[in-house]
Amino acid sequence: SARVQQAVHDAVRDLQGERSRSELSVPLVAQRAGVTPSTVYRRWGTLQELLADVARERMRPDDPPDDTGALETVLKAWARQYLEEISSSPGREYVRDLVASEGEENSEQCNRYCQVKIRAILDRAAARGEPHPDADTVTDRVTAPIVFRVFFSPGDPEPAWAEALVDQVLADL
């Protein structure tokens, strides 16, 4: 039920704030959520799949990005926010959980969530008559480099670097 899912997700998020990853277990999550471990296993199969499901839900877009004006301004603000979210400790953990999950559905869903936000920005630019790239171009040339840099390069990228990625995309229009 939706109530069980919410209770289990809340328990995972609470426990992630209190304990290290190695201390998490299905019985611990179940106890915190007020359900039996078999309920968790039946629904998610493994702790890793549960963690991936929580990560996917966290990445679900709540609202479209703020429309603060021109495409350049909005896309740069979104790129800075995306960089900040994904480079935070919880953001890194969520991405790791998604990548470690079996199958591709969680990763594909997160890509769709990201595309929804990007398309909202681009659709508003189109409505204003602004030239704009397509969502795949923004994903390939802004989102993907951010993810790569956060996970595979030393140090955290600066927000100005994320803005420069947007500048490069817009310069090619």
What label would you give each PLM region?
Residues 112-115, 126-169:
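Hydrophobic/aromatic-rich alpha-helical bundle segments in the mid-to-C-terminal region
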Residues 26, 55-62:
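Short, basic, alpha-helical segments at the C-terminal edge of helix-turn-helix-like DNA-binding modules
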Residues 18-21, 41-51:
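HTH DNA-binding helix-turn interface
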Residues 33-37:
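Short coil turns linking two alpha-helices in DNA-binding domains
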Residues 63-92, 139:
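Hydrophobic alpha-helical connector segments
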Residues 1-32:
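Basic, helix-initiating cap at the start of DNA-binding domains
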Residues 48-55, 84-105:
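Amphipathic alpha-helical segments used for helix-helix packing
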Residues 84-85, 103-128, 140:
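Amphipathic alpha-helical packing segments from all-alpha helical-bundle domains
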